[in-house]
Amino acid sequence: MDVEIFPHRLLSAETTEKLLNKLGEIEGIKRMIIQGQRLPAGEHPDRRVINVKGQDIELKVKTGRIFVEIEDKKTMEKIKEVCDEVFPFKYELIPGTFFRRQKTVTDAIKFGKDVDKLPTELVGMTDTVLD
Protein backbone atom coordinates (compact mmCIF):
# COMPACT_ATOMS: atom_id res chain seq x y z
CA MET A 1 0.00 0.00 0.00
CA ASP A 2 1.24 3.49 -0.82
CA VAL A 3 0.34 6.94 0.47
CA GLU A 4 0.94 10.34 -1.09
CA ILE A 5 1.48 13.21 1.34
CA PHE A 6 0.39 16.33 -0.53
CA PRO A 7 1.10 19.50 1.47
CA HIS A 8 -0.76 22.60 0.30
CA ARG A 9 2.56 24.47 0.27
CA LEU A 10 6.05 23.73 -0.98
CA LEU A 11 8.26 22.61 1.89
CA SER A 12 11.47 24.32 2.98
CA ALA A 13 14.62 22.26 3.44
CA GLU A 14 14.15 22.44 7.22
CA THR A 15 10.56 21.20 7.08
CA THR A 16 11.50 18.45 4.62
CA GLU A 17 14.30 17.29 6.92
CA LYS A 18 12.07 17.37 10.00
CA LEU A 19 9.25 15.48 8.25
CA LEU A 20 11.50 12.77 6.79
CA ASN A 21 13.21 12.18 10.14
CA LYS A 22 9.89 11.85 11.97
CA LEU A 23 8.52 9.55 9.26
CA GLY A 24 11.72 7.51 9.52
CA GLU A 25 10.85 6.70 13.13
CA ILE A 26 7.59 5.01 12.12
CA GLU A 27 7.63 1.23 11.90
CA GLY A 28 5.79 0.00 8.84
CA ILE A 29 7.29 2.45 6.35
CA LYS A 30 9.26 0.62 3.68
CA ARG A 31 10.52 3.49 1.49
CA MET A 32 9.92 7.16 0.69
CA ILE A 33 10.42 9.41 -2.33
CA ILE A 34 10.21 13.20 -2.35
CA GLN A 35 9.06 14.96 -5.51
CA GLY A 36 9.07 18.59 -6.45
CA GLN A 37 10.36 21.22 -8.79
CA ARG A 38 14.12 21.40 -9.27
CA LEU A 39 15.91 24.10 -7.36
CA PRO A 40 17.37 26.79 -9.64
CA ALA A 41 21.04 26.55 -10.60
CA GLY A 42 23.45 28.47 -8.41
CA GLU A 43 22.95 29.47 -4.83
CA HIS A 44 19.56 28.88 -3.24
CA PRO A 45 18.71 28.73 0.48
CA ASP A 46 17.12 25.29 0.11
CA ARG A 47 20.03 23.84 -1.89
CA ARG A 48 21.81 22.13 0.95
CA VAL A 49 22.56 18.80 2.52
CA ILE A 50 19.89 17.48 4.88
CA ASN A 51 20.44 14.67 7.35
CA VAL A 52 17.82 11.93 7.38
CA LYS A 53 18.27 9.10 9.87
CA GLY A 54 22.01 9.79 10.04
CA GLN A 55 22.48 9.86 6.26
CA ASP A 56 23.45 13.06 4.44
CA ILE A 57 21.31 13.74 1.36
CA GLU A 58 21.79 16.63 -1.06
CA LEU A 59 18.40 18.29 -1.54
CA LYS A 60 17.92 19.13 -5.22
CA VAL A 61 14.17 19.83 -5.26
CA LYS A 62 11.67 22.06 -3.49
CA THR A 63 9.56 19.33 -1.89
CA GLY A 64 5.97 19.32 -3.12
CA ARG A 65 4.92 15.70 -2.53
CA ILE A 66 6.15 12.75 -0.54
CA PHE A 67 5.34 9.20 -1.61
CA VAL A 68 5.50 6.57 1.13
CA GLU A 69 5.25 2.79 0.78
CA ILE A 70 3.65 1.35 3.90
CA GLU A 71 2.86 -2.11 5.26
CA ASP A 72 -0.72 -1.51 6.44
CA LYS A 73 -3.45 1.06 7.14
CA LYS A 74 -2.36 1.49 10.77
CA THR A 75 0.84 3.07 9.49
CA MET A 76 -1.24 5.67 7.64
CA GLU A 77 -2.69 6.86 10.97
CA LYS A 78 0.84 7.32 12.34
CA ILE A 79 1.78 9.30 9.22
CA LYS A 80 -1.26 11.53 9.80
CA GLU A 81 -0.11 12.21 13.39
CA VAL A 82 3.36 13.22 12.16
CA CYS A 83 1.93 15.48 9.45
CA ASP A 84 -0.40 17.14 11.99
CA GLU A 85 2.63 17.82 14.18
CA VAL A 86 4.98 19.09 11.43
CA PHE A 87 2.64 21.05 9.13
CA PRO A 88 1.05 24.30 10.34
CA PHE A 89 -1.01 24.28 7.11
CA LYS A 90 -3.40 21.95 5.31
CA TYR A 91 -2.30 18.79 3.55
CA GLU A 92 -3.86 15.68 2.05
CA LEU A 93 -3.07 12.00 2.57
CA ILE A 94 -3.99 10.11 -0.57
CA PRO A 95 -3.87 6.29 -0.60
CA GLY A 96 -3.06 4.66 -3.93
CA THR A 97 -0.37 2.92 -5.94
CA PHE A 98 2.63 5.18 -6.56
CA PHE A 99 5.60 2.77 -6.59
CA ARG A 100 6.39 0.22 -9.28
CA ARG A 101 6.93 -3.21 -7.79
CA GLN A 102 7.99 -5.18 -10.85
CA LYS A 103 10.76 -4.72 -13.39
CA THR A 104 9.50 -3.54 -16.77
CA VAL A 105 10.66 -3.74 -20.38
CA THR A 106 12.03 -0.21 -19.91
CA ASP A 107 14.18 -1.47 -17.03
CA ALA A 108 15.47 -4.29 -19.23
CA ILE A 109 16.41 -1.79 -21.96
CA LYS A 110 17.96 0.64 -19.48
CA PHE A 111 20.00 -1.92 -17.51
CA GLY A 112 20.51 -4.65 -20.11
CA LYS A 113 21.85 -7.88 -18.66
CA ASP A 114 22.28 -6.13 -15.28
CA VAL A 115 18.49 -5.87 -14.82
CA ASP A 116 18.56 -8.97 -12.59
CA LYS A 117 21.02 -7.19 -10.26
CA LEU A 118 18.46 -4.44 -9.57
CA PRO A 119 17.11 -5.05 -6.04
CA THR A 120 13.31 -5.16 -5.78
CA GLU A 121 13.27 -2.24 -3.32
CA LEU A 122 14.98 -0.01 -5.94
CA VAL A 123 12.60 -0.78 -8.82
CA GLY A 124 11.32 2.56 -10.12
CA MET A 125 13.70 4.57 -7.94
CA THR A 126 17.09 4.51 -9.70
CA ASP A 127 18.70 4.79 -13.12
CA THR A 128 21.89 2.96 -12.16
CA VAL A 129 22.58 -0.53 -10.91
CA LEU A 130 24.56 -0.67 -7.69
CA ASP A 131 27.19 -3.41 -7.41
From Swiss-Prot:
The record's listing under InterPro entries reads: Me_CoM_Rdtase_D (IPR003901)
Q: Does the keyword Coiled coil apply?
A: no
What biological process terms from GO does the record include?
methanogenesis
Pfam families under this entry?
MCR_D
**Is Nucleotide-binding among this UniProt entry's keywords?**
no
NCBIfam families reported for this sequence? met_CoM_red_D
| Quaternary state and interactors | MCR is composed of three subunits: alpha, beta, and gamma. The function of proteins C and D is not known.
- Name used for this protein in its record: Methyl-coenzyme M reductase operon protein D
